Amino acid sequence: MTLPLLGPMTLSGFAHSWFFLFLFVVAGLVALYILMQLARQRRMLRFANMELLESVAPKRPSRWRHVPAILLVLSLLLFTIAMAGPTHDVRIPRNRAVVMLVIDVSQSMRATDVEPSRMVAAQEAAKQFADELTPGINLGLIAYAGTATVLVSPTTNREATKNALDKLQFADRTATGEAIFTALQAIATVGAVIGGGDTPPPARIVLFSDGKETMPTNPDNPKGAYTAARTAKDQGVPISTISFGTPYGFVEIDDQRQPVPVDDETMKKVAQLSGGNSYNAATLAELRAVYSSLQQQIGYETIKGDASVGWLRLGALALALAALAALLINRRLPT
Protein backbone atom coordinates (compact mmCIF):
# COMPACT_ATOMS: atom_id res chain seq x y z
CA MET A 1 0.00 0.00 0.00
CA THR A 2 1.32 3.43 -0.96
CA LEU A 3 -0.05 6.54 0.74
CA PRO A 4 0.38 10.15 -0.43
CA LEU A 5 3.21 11.99 1.36
CA LEU A 6 4.11 8.82 3.26
CA GLY A 7 5.17 6.40 0.54
CA PRO A 8 4.97 2.60 0.60
CA MET A 9 3.78 1.09 3.87
CA THR A 10 3.70 -2.62 4.60
CA LEU A 11 3.70 -4.96 7.58
CA SER A 12 5.68 -7.79 6.03
CA GLY A 13 9.17 -8.84 5.01
CA PHE A 14 10.85 -7.35 8.08
CA ALA A 15 14.63 -7.15 7.70
CA HIS A 16 15.34 -6.61 11.42
CA SER A 17 12.43 -8.26 13.20
CA TRP A 18 14.39 -8.48 16.46
CA PHE A 19 13.62 -4.76 16.94
CA PHE A 20 10.13 -5.85 17.96
CA LEU A 21 11.67 -6.73 21.33
CA PHE A 22 11.46 -3.00 21.98
CA LEU A 23 7.71 -3.50 22.35
CA PHE A 24 8.42 -4.89 25.82
CA VAL A 25 9.88 -1.50 26.72
CA VAL A 26 6.77 0.20 25.36
CA ALA A 27 4.57 -2.17 27.37
CA GLY A 28 6.61 -1.35 30.47
CA LEU A 29 6.10 2.37 29.93
CA VAL A 30 2.35 1.84 29.56
CA ALA A 31 2.27 -0.16 32.79
CA LEU A 32 4.29 2.53 34.56
CA TYR A 33 1.90 5.23 33.37
CA ILE A 34 -1.11 3.26 34.64
CA LEU A 35 0.56 2.76 38.03
CA MET A 36 1.31 6.48 38.24
CA GLN A 37 -2.33 7.30 37.54
CA LEU A 38 -3.52 4.86 40.21
CA ALA A 39 -1.07 6.32 42.73
CA ARG A 40 -2.32 9.81 41.88
CA GLN A 41 -5.89 8.75 42.62
CA ARG A 42 -4.87 7.24 45.97
CA ARG A 43 -3.12 10.46 46.97
CA MET A 44 -6.25 12.43 46.19
CA LEU A 45 -8.40 10.10 48.31
CA ARG A 46 -6.22 10.78 51.37
CA PHE A 47 -8.06 14.03 51.84
CA ALA A 48 -10.43 13.36 54.71
CA ASN A 49 -12.42 16.50 54.10
CA MET A 50 -13.97 16.04 50.65
CA GLU A 51 -15.38 19.58 50.77
CA LEU A 52 -11.83 20.90 51.18
CA LEU A 53 -10.70 18.73 48.26
CA GLU A 54 -13.46 20.09 46.04
CA SER A 55 -12.55 23.65 47.00
CA VAL A 56 -8.88 23.04 46.16
CA ALA A 57 -9.62 21.15 42.94
CA PRO A 58 -13.15 22.12 41.93
CA LYS A 59 -12.87 20.44 38.57
CA ARG A 60 -12.24 16.76 38.10
CA PRO A 61 -9.29 15.98 35.81
CA SER A 62 -10.48 15.59 32.24
CA ARG A 63 -10.02 12.32 30.42
CA TRP A 64 -8.39 14.34 27.65
CA ARG A 65 -5.28 14.49 29.82
CA HIS A 66 -4.43 10.97 28.63
CA VAL A 67 -4.29 11.96 24.95
CA PRO A 68 -0.63 13.09 25.01
CA ALA A 69 0.46 9.83 26.62
CA ILE A 70 -1.56 7.78 24.12
CA LEU A 71 0.00 9.66 21.21
CA LEU A 72 3.45 9.18 22.72
CA VAL A 73 2.92 5.41 22.98
CA LEU A 74 1.58 5.36 19.42
CA SER A 75 4.70 7.13 18.17
CA LEU A 76 6.89 4.56 19.92
CA LEU A 77 4.94 1.74 18.27
CA LEU A 78 5.34 3.36 14.85
CA PHE A 79 9.06 3.92 15.40
CA THR A 80 9.42 0.27 16.40
CA ILE A 81 7.80 -0.89 13.17
CA ALA A 82 10.13 1.40 11.21
CA MET A 83 13.22 0.07 13.00
CA ALA A 84 12.15 -3.51 12.24
CA GLY A 85 12.66 -2.70 8.56
CA PRO A 86 9.48 -3.57 6.66
CA THR A 87 9.96 -4.17 2.94
CA HIS A 88 7.82 -4.09 -0.17
CA ASP A 89 8.10 -5.37 -3.72
CA VAL A 90 9.82 -2.98 -6.12
CA ARG A 91 9.91 -3.51 -9.88
CA ILE A 92 13.17 -2.38 -11.46
CA PRO A 93 14.34 -2.63 -15.08
CA ARG A 94 16.56 -5.57 -15.90
CA ASN A 95 19.97 -4.76 -17.34
CA ARG A 96 21.59 -8.17 -17.80
CA ALA A 97 18.77 -10.26 -19.27
CA VAL A 98 18.82 -11.89 -22.71
CA VAL A 99 15.67 -12.37 -24.79
CA MET A 100 15.62 -14.34 -28.03
CA LEU A 101 12.68 -13.55 -30.29
CA VAL A 102 12.10 -16.65 -32.44
CA ILE A 103 9.67 -16.17 -35.34
CA ASP A 104 8.18 -18.78 -37.66
CA VAL A 105 8.52 -17.75 -41.35
CA SER A 106 7.05 -20.89 -42.90
CA GLN A 107 4.60 -20.64 -45.81
CA SER A 108 1.61 -20.80 -43.46
CA MET A 109 2.49 -17.28 -42.33
CA ARG A 110 1.11 -16.05 -45.67
CA ALA A 111 -2.43 -16.75 -44.44
CA THR A 112 -4.72 -13.74 -44.35
CA ASP A 113 -7.10 -14.91 -41.64
CA VAL A 114 -5.42 -12.17 -39.61
CA GLU A 115 -5.40 -8.84 -41.40
CA PRO A 116 -3.41 -7.91 -43.38
CA SER A 117 -1.62 -11.27 -43.02
CA ARG A 118 -0.09 -13.35 -40.28
CA MET A 119 3.42 -12.29 -41.27
CA VAL A 120 2.74 -8.56 -41.48
CA ALA A 121 0.88 -8.60 -38.16
CA ALA A 122 3.75 -10.53 -36.58
CA GLN A 123 6.28 -8.00 -37.87
CA GLU A 124 4.33 -5.00 -36.57
CA ALA A 125 3.74 -6.49 -33.13
CA ALA A 126 7.35 -7.68 -32.80
CA LYS A 127 8.68 -4.22 -33.65
CA GLN A 128 6.43 -2.69 -31.03
CA PHE A 129 7.72 -5.27 -28.54
CA ALA A 130 11.31 -4.29 -29.40
CA ASP A 131 10.53 -0.60 -28.92
CA GLU A 132 8.90 -1.08 -25.53
CA LEU A 133 11.36 -3.59 -24.09
CA THR A 134 13.56 -2.28 -21.29
CA PRO A 135 16.64 -0.65 -22.90
CA GLY A 136 19.16 -2.66 -20.89
CA ILE A 137 17.92 -6.04 -22.15
CA ASN A 138 19.85 -7.78 -24.92
CA LEU A 139 17.36 -8.73 -27.64
CA GLY A 140 18.15 -11.22 -30.40
CA LEU A 141 16.16 -12.41 -33.41
CA ILE A 142 15.90 -15.84 -35.03
CA ALA A 143 13.82 -16.68 -38.10
CA TYR A 144 13.03 -20.30 -38.80
CA ALA A 145 11.25 -22.55 -41.23
CA GLY A 146 13.06 -25.71 -42.37
CA THR A 147 16.21 -24.29 -40.76
CA ALA A 148 16.86 -21.64 -38.14
CA THR A 149 18.97 -18.55 -38.73
CA VAL A 150 20.23 -16.01 -36.22
CA LEU A 151 19.40 -12.71 -37.89
CA VAL A 152 20.45 -10.55 -34.95
CA SER A 153 22.67 -11.67 -32.09
CA PRO A 154 21.49 -10.43 -28.68
CA THR A 155 22.09 -6.69 -28.50
CA THR A 156 20.64 -3.56 -26.95
CA ASN A 157 20.46 -2.00 -30.42
CA ARG A 158 16.74 -2.17 -31.18
CA GLU A 159 17.11 -0.73 -34.69
CA ALA A 160 19.05 -3.81 -35.78
CA THR A 161 16.19 -6.04 -34.69
CA LYS A 162 13.51 -3.90 -36.31
CA ASN A 163 15.42 -3.70 -39.59
CA ALA A 164 15.80 -7.48 -39.63
CA LEU A 165 12.08 -7.93 -38.95
CA ASP A 166 11.28 -5.90 -42.06
CA LYS A 167 13.37 -8.29 -44.17
CA LEU A 168 11.87 -11.62 -43.12
CA GLN A 169 11.49 -14.08 -46.01
CA PHE A 170 9.13 -17.05 -46.34
CA ALA A 171 10.53 -20.58 -46.51
CA ASP A 172 9.27 -24.17 -46.54
CA ARG A 173 8.62 -26.49 -43.60
CA THR A 174 8.80 -25.85 -39.84
CA ALA A 175 11.68 -26.96 -37.60
CA THR A 176 10.65 -25.63 -34.21
CA GLY A 177 13.07 -27.81 -32.27
CA GLU A 178 16.07 -26.57 -34.27
CA ALA A 179 14.94 -22.98 -33.69
CA ILE A 180 14.87 -23.51 -29.92
CA PHE A 181 18.29 -25.18 -29.91
CA THR A 182 19.68 -22.29 -31.97
CA ALA A 183 18.25 -19.78 -29.51
CA LEU A 184 19.80 -21.64 -26.58
CA GLN A 185 23.19 -21.56 -28.30
CA ALA A 186 22.90 -17.81 -28.92
CA ILE A 187 21.96 -17.26 -25.27
CA ALA A 188 24.93 -19.31 -24.06
CA THR A 189 27.29 -17.36 -26.31
CA VAL A 190 26.18 -13.92 -25.20
CA GLY A 191 25.95 -15.09 -21.59
CA ALA A 192 29.65 -15.92 -21.62
CA VAL A 193 30.39 -12.40 -22.84
CA ILE A 194 28.13 -10.32 -20.57
CA GLY A 195 28.05 -12.64 -17.55
CA GLY A 196 29.33 -10.10 -15.05
CA GLY A 197 28.56 -12.37 -12.10
CA ASP A 198 28.71 -15.86 -10.64
CA THR A 199 25.58 -16.88 -12.54
CA PRO A 200 24.64 -16.41 -16.19
CA PRO A 201 22.26 -13.57 -16.98
CA PRO A 202 18.56 -14.44 -16.87
CA ALA A 203 17.26 -15.41 -20.30
CA ARG A 204 14.01 -16.20 -22.04
CA ILE A 205 12.89 -17.37 -25.44
CA VAL A 206 9.78 -15.82 -27.00
CA LEU A 207 8.62 -18.34 -29.61
CA PHE A 208 6.13 -17.16 -32.21
CA SER A 209 4.51 -19.73 -34.48
CA ASP A 210 1.21 -20.51 -36.18
CA GLY A 211 1.54 -24.18 -36.99
CA LYS A 212 2.85 -27.47 -35.73
CA GLU A 213 6.35 -28.74 -36.31
CA THR A 214 6.99 -30.63 -39.57
CA MET A 215 10.75 -31.28 -39.19
CA PRO A 216 10.83 -33.73 -37.50
CA THR A 217 7.22 -34.84 -37.41
CA ASN A 218 7.66 -36.32 -33.93
CA PRO A 219 8.35 -33.51 -31.42
CA ASP A 220 9.94 -36.03 -29.04
CA ASN A 221 12.65 -36.74 -31.62
CA PRO A 222 16.17 -35.74 -30.42
CA LYS A 223 15.85 -32.63 -32.60
CA GLY A 224 12.14 -32.12 -31.94
CA ALA A 225 10.37 -29.27 -30.22
CA TYR A 226 9.57 -31.15 -27.02
CA THR A 227 13.15 -32.35 -26.63
CA ALA A 228 14.39 -28.80 -27.15
CA ALA A 229 11.88 -27.51 -24.59
CA ARG A 230 13.17 -29.99 -22.01
CA THR A 231 16.72 -28.85 -22.73
CA ALA A 232 15.65 -25.24 -22.22
CA LYS A 233 14.15 -26.25 -18.87
CA ASP A 234 17.44 -27.88 -17.85
CA GLN A 235 19.33 -24.71 -18.77
CA GLY A 236 16.93 -22.48 -16.86
CA VAL A 237 15.57 -20.75 -19.95
CA PRO A 238 11.75 -20.62 -19.97
CA ILE A 239 9.98 -20.37 -23.31
CA SER A 240 7.01 -18.05 -23.75
CA THR A 241 5.06 -19.37 -26.72
CA ILE A 242 2.64 -17.38 -28.85
CA SER A 243 0.35 -19.32 -31.17
CA PHE A 244 -0.99 -16.89 -33.73
CA GLY A 245 -3.85 -17.32 -36.16
CA THR A 246 -7.30 -18.92 -36.38
CA PRO A 247 -8.53 -22.47 -37.07
CA TYR A 248 -9.73 -21.27 -40.48
CA GLY A 249 -6.50 -20.01 -42.03
CA PHE A 250 -5.43 -21.17 -45.49
CA VAL A 251 -2.81 -20.42 -48.13
CA GLU A 252 -2.74 -20.84 -51.90
CA ILE A 253 0.05 -23.19 -53.04
CA ASP A 254 0.22 -24.17 -56.73
CA ASP A 255 -3.31 -22.83 -57.19
CA GLN A 256 -4.59 -25.10 -54.46
CA ARG A 257 -6.03 -24.01 -51.17
CA GLN A 258 -4.17 -25.55 -48.23
CA PRO A 259 -5.67 -25.23 -44.74
CA VAL A 260 -3.19 -23.97 -42.14
CA PRO A 261 -5.05 -23.97 -38.81
CA VAL A 262 -3.22 -22.62 -35.80
CA ASP A 263 -1.75 -25.34 -33.56
CA ASP A 264 -2.28 -24.30 -29.95
CA GLU A 265 -1.62 -27.68 -28.35
CA THR A 266 1.99 -28.04 -29.47
CA MET A 267 2.85 -24.53 -28.37
CA LYS A 268 1.22 -25.06 -24.97
CA LYS A 269 3.21 -28.26 -24.47
CA VAL A 270 6.48 -26.54 -25.42
CA ALA A 271 5.81 -23.78 -22.89
CA GLN A 272 4.84 -26.27 -20.20
CA LEU A 273 7.91 -28.46 -20.70
CA SER A 274 10.23 -25.46 -20.53
CA GLY A 275 8.64 -23.88 -17.48
CA GLY A 276 7.26 -20.94 -19.45
CA ASN A 277 3.86 -19.58 -20.35
CA SER A 278 1.71 -20.01 -23.44
CA TYR A 279 -0.41 -17.40 -25.16
CA ASN A 280 -2.67 -17.35 -28.17
CA ALA A 281 -3.82 -14.50 -30.36
CA ALA A 282 -6.22 -14.38 -33.29
CA THR A 283 -5.97 -10.67 -34.13
CA LEU A 284 -3.27 -8.02 -34.30
CA ALA A 285 -4.74 -6.27 -31.26
CA GLU A 286 -4.59 -9.49 -29.25
CA LEU A 287 -1.03 -10.10 -30.39
CA ARG A 288 0.02 -6.62 -29.29
CA ALA A 289 -1.61 -7.23 -25.91
CA VAL A 290 0.35 -10.47 -25.53
CA TYR A 291 3.63 -8.76 -26.38
CA SER A 292 2.82 -5.95 -23.95
CA SER A 293 2.23 -8.48 -21.18
CA LEU A 294 5.50 -10.22 -21.99
CA GLN A 295 7.34 -6.92 -21.98
CA GLN A 296 6.17 -6.28 -18.42
CA GLN A 297 7.21 -9.77 -17.31
CA ILE A 298 10.58 -9.85 -19.06
CA GLY A 299 11.64 -6.22 -18.83
CA TYR A 300 11.46 -5.93 -15.06
CA GLU A 301 12.44 -7.88 -12.01
CA THR A 302 10.96 -7.65 -8.53
CA ILE A 303 13.21 -7.00 -5.56
CA LYS A 304 12.60 -6.12 -1.92
CA GLY A 305 12.72 -2.39 -1.20
CA ASP A 306 12.71 -0.47 2.08
CA ALA A 307 9.27 0.54 3.36
CA SER A 308 10.25 2.05 6.72
CA VAL A 309 10.18 5.74 5.73
CA GLY A 310 6.40 5.97 5.88
CA TRP A 311 6.33 4.52 9.39
CA LEU A 312 9.07 6.96 10.48
CA ARG A 313 7.04 9.87 9.15
CA LEU A 314 3.91 8.68 10.93
CA GLY A 315 5.89 8.21 14.14
CA ALA A 316 7.32 11.71 13.91
CA LEU A 317 3.82 13.10 13.30
CA ALA A 318 2.42 11.24 16.31
CA LEU A 319 5.30 12.50 18.48
CA ALA A 320 4.72 16.09 17.37
CA LEU A 321 1.00 15.77 18.09
CA ALA A 322 1.80 14.34 21.53
CA ALA A 323 3.92 17.38 22.37
CA LEU A 324 1.28 19.77 21.03
CA ALA A 325 -1.52 18.02 22.94
CA ALA A 326 0.50 18.12 26.15
CA LEU A 327 1.02 21.86 25.83
CA LEU A 328 -2.62 22.53 25.02
CA ILE A 329 -4.27 20.11 27.47
CA ASN A 330 -1.85 19.67 30.37
CA ARG A 331 0.25 22.81 29.83
CA ARG A 332 3.40 20.68 29.91
CA LEU A 333 5.24 18.05 27.93
CA PRO A 334 4.07 14.45 28.47
CA THR A 335 5.87 12.55 31.22
Swiss-Prot record:
<keyword id="KW-1133">Transmembrane helix</keyword>
<comment type="similarity">
    <text>Belongs to the UPF0353 family.</text>
</comment>
<dbReference type="InterPro" id="IPR050768">
    <property type="entry name" value="UPF0353/GerABKA_families"/>
</dbReference>
<dbReference type="GO" id="GO:0005886">
    <property type="term" value="C:plasma membrane"/>
</dbReference>
<keyword id="KW-0812">Transmembrane</keyword>
<dbReference type="Pfam" id="PF13519">
    <property type="entry name" value="VWA_2"/>
</dbReference>
<dbReference type="InterPro" id="IPR036465">
    <property type="entry name" value="vWFA_dom_sf"/>
</dbReference>
<dbReference type="InterPro" id="IPR002035">
    <property type="entry name" value="VWF_A"/>
</dbReference>
<dbReference type="Pfam" id="PF07584">
    <property type="entry name" value="BatA"/>
</dbReference>
<feature type="domain" description="VWFA">
    <location>
        <begin position="98"/>
        <end position="294"/>
    </location>
</feature>
<protein>
    <recommendedName>
        <fullName>UPF0353 protein BCG_1543</fullName>
    </recommendedName>
</protein>
<keyword id="KW-0472">Membrane</keyword>
<feature type="transmembrane region" description="Helical">
    <location>
        <begin position="309"/>
        <end position="329"/>
    </location>
</feature>
<feature type="transmembrane region" description="Helical">
    <location>
        <begin position="67"/>
        <end position="87"/>
    </location>
</feature>
<dbReference type="InterPro" id="IPR024163">
    <property type="entry name" value="Aerotolerance_reg_N"/>
</dbReference>
<keyword id="KW-1003">Cell membrane</keyword>
<feature type="transmembrane region" description="Helical">
    <location>
        <begin position="18"/>
        <end position="38"/>
    </location>
</feature>
<dbReference type="InterPro" id="IPR022933">
    <property type="entry name" value="UPF0353"/>
</dbReference>
